[in-house]
A protein has these predicted regions:
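Extracellular glycan-interaction surfaces
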Residues: 5
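Acidic/polar-rich alpha-helix caps and helix-coil junctions
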Residues: 1, 9-219
């Protein structure tokens, strides 16, 4: 496993990683009906988001520019295209070009390149196949675009959104010490994902205009 986890403290807040005390109010899955209303001064998973949270945040609105598209996205988009083209046509050079693009992101983050990291992995050959690089670039997208509204669409176009119906794990928020807090704990919420959710429903206002439009399955 590459050491990308070293970036975790910079994007996520957790016990022993806090820099200052701020009292905030939380809501826990109120939109899903699991527990409506405020839940007090705690987080259900033991984690808090740190990325995009302004250092001056004090429970009031803070305005600052939000990137619509970043250079990192263009690099990873092109890398993904090259990997899929190689899988279809099995040509030379595309995988190396894709790795070079991904490495731009990794080097900027201060972590080893793909080849350097996977030399120490259990399956070093993974970085030299289209199938292996596909998994690598998808993982890079998940980490690089954390909370940037990419994951929702990525999982659907990859047809991997079924993982959204799997169990969710967090820390033991009732733990009083590091030993009892840092224990993987299954959250008591039920998530489901249906095949129909790969497509959006066509608004009734549109189907009423054109009766011949066939509604997407499941809606």
């Amino acid at each position: 496993r590459p050491p990308r986890s070293t970036l975790f403290p910079y994007t996520t807040l957790f016990r022993s990683n806090a820099k200052k005390a701020i009292v905030v109010k939380f809501r826990k899955n109120d939109a899903n009906g699991w527990e409506d209303g405020q839940t007090g001064n705690y987080t259900g998973t033991g984690y808090l988001n740190k990325k995009f949270v302004h250092p001056a945040f004090q429970n009031g609105p803070v305005h600052y520019p939000y990137p619509v598209i970043r250079m990192a996205e263009m690099y990873l988009n092109l890398a993904e295209i090259l990997i899929e083209l190689d899988a279809l046509e099995n040509t030379t050079g595309r995988l190396e070009e894709a790795k070079g693009l991904i490495d731009k992101i990794r080097v900027r983050a201060g972590i080893p390149t793909i080849d350097e990291a996977w030399k120490k992995a259990n399956h070093p050959e993974k970085a030299n196949t289209a199938e292996g690089l596909r998994e690598i670039v998808r993982r890079e997208r998940q980490i690089e675009f954390y909370l940037e509204n990419q994951r929702f669409w990525d999982l659907r176009r990859w047809k991997d959104a079924g993982i959204l119906g799997e169990k969710v794990w967090g820390m033991n928020i009732e733990g009083d010490t590091d030993e009892t807090f840092f224990v993987p704990t299954e959250l008591q919420n039920i998530r489901t994902f249906k095949q129909a959710q790969y497509l959006m429903p066509i608004p009734m206002t549109e189907t009423n205009k054109v009766p011949h439009i066939v509604q997407n399955p499941g809606y």
